[in-house]
């Protein structure tokens, strides 16, 4: 029996910026890939998550959101701010996004390494700051979205993402639904 969700995918877009240099962008990309693989391998999500890269500029955000709008397989977009991602760079893309949006407010690491933490770690792992600013700009713009707060590997977080994915699939099906009233 075919899974009705197999025809769909949800795109995962990470927010960052080039301020911290190329090594940071490489690390952000590696963390994002690990998260997407972990989400898909959890067995808890009905729709495949596809990593669409790290957006480091307004133009990159706009391009990926336009592509999401034009891809029938994409039924929603998950955003995550790995480092401090300036909220203003998301404005034009958010204005154009027509697909359901989930803001995943999480950290890559479950535990904070208090004993070894240094400025490099802090610069790379600013999800709390970036996610708050992203949430603020979405609220100011009145962007409809689902916000999921919690560690990305936890059962409750995965459950909330899965529920949202099923809603996205229903939304996608309704976009070309023909009804006849008798």
Predicted regions and their residues:
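Glycine- and acidic-residue-enriched helix-capping/strand-helix junction motifs
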Residues: 17-33, 121-127
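Short beta-strand elements in bilobed, periplasmic/extracellular small-molecule ligand-binding domains
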Residues: 38-54, 144-150
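Structural motif
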Residues: 53-66, 157-161
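Short, well-structured alpha-helical segments in soluble
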Residues: 61-75, 91-93
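Periplasmic-binding protein-like
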Residues: 74-84, 102-104
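Short, acidic/small-residue loops that bind anionic groups at enzyme active sites
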Residues: 92-118, 122-133
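A charged, well-structured terminal subsegment
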Residues: 134-168
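Conserved small/polar residues in nucleotide/adenosyl-binding loops
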Residues: 180-182
């Amino acid at each position: 029996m075919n899974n009705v969700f197999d025809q769909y995918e949800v795109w995962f877009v990470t927010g960052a910026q080039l301020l911290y240099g190329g090594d940071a962008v490489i690390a952000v990309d590696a963390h994002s890939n690990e998260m997407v693989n972990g989400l898909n391998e959890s067995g808890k999500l009905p729709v495949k998550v596809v990593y669409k890269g790290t957006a480091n500029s307004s133009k990159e955000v706009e391009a990926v959101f336009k592509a999401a709008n034009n891809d029938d397989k994409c039924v929603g977009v998950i955003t995550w701010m790995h480092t401090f991602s300036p909220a203003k760079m998301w404005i034009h893309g958010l204005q154009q996004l027509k697909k359901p949006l989930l803001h995943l407010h999480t950290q890559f690491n479950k535990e904070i390494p208090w004993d070894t933490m240094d400025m490099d770690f802090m610069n790379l792992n600013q999800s709390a700051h970036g996610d708050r600013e992203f949430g603020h700009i979405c609220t100011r713009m009145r962007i409809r979205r689902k916000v999921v707060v919690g560690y990305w590997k936890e059962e409750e977080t995965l459950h909330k993402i899965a529920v949202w994915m099923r809603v996205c699939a229903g939304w996608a099906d309704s976009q070309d639904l023909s009804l006849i009233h008798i």
